[in-house]
Amino acid sequence: MFKYKPKLLVIRIALRYKEGYLLPEDKYDANNHGRYNKYLRSKSKEVKEDLDSLIKLLKIIYKNDLVGYMWKLRYDCYKQFYYQLMIFLDGDKCSKDIAIAKDICGLWKDIVTQGNGECTNFNAYKKPHTNLGLGLRYADERELVIQDAKIFIEHDYFVSSMLSGKQQRTFSKSHIPGETRSGRPSKFQKIIDTHYL
């Protein structure tokens, strides 16, 4: 992406749900293994739809500034399904990474999940020796960005085994060249116009 923009604003957030929101009524045991896995597969589709909704909103709000993004679906017994999301904005036009990440977290919590979501803004917790690839980065700092992005290629065996053969991705990246496309307005445009802009 540095080929398109020599300066990028790199944002990383974790998108999840409030505790208990994705949990089934019955806890897992050996007798309900199949039913539990079916429930988890249906929930994985729901969280993917929410991620798609957020990305559509980002394409509207940052249509001239969004250079690309990548996401990774993860699962653990406490957070249930959640997404790691890394966003790349044009560094010549955007510089306030913490504020932008906070706004994106607000979109996730208030609009996409209608109050059922939670979000971690990693840009707000940058420390001197961690998350060095976040914030405003130049082309000669690409290795720092790569180090921060390595979490996206770590294999999650539980998620991939549960979704195998289901034609559902656990990782994806998108590259958005600087040109804007014309087309019919998104259903989210009205929401953005009335709530966020």
Outline where the language-model segments fall.
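A structural signal for short, well-ordered beta-strand segments and their strand-loop junctions
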Residues: 12, 82, 117-121
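A short acidic (Asp/Glu
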Residues: 23-24, 80-84, 97-99
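A generic structural motif
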Residues: 19-21, 90-93
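Signature for HUH/AEP ssDNA processing cores
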Residues: 1-70, 74-75
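Catalytic "initiation/cleavage/transfer" segments centered on a nucleophilic residue
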Residues: 1-3, 29-32, 91-197
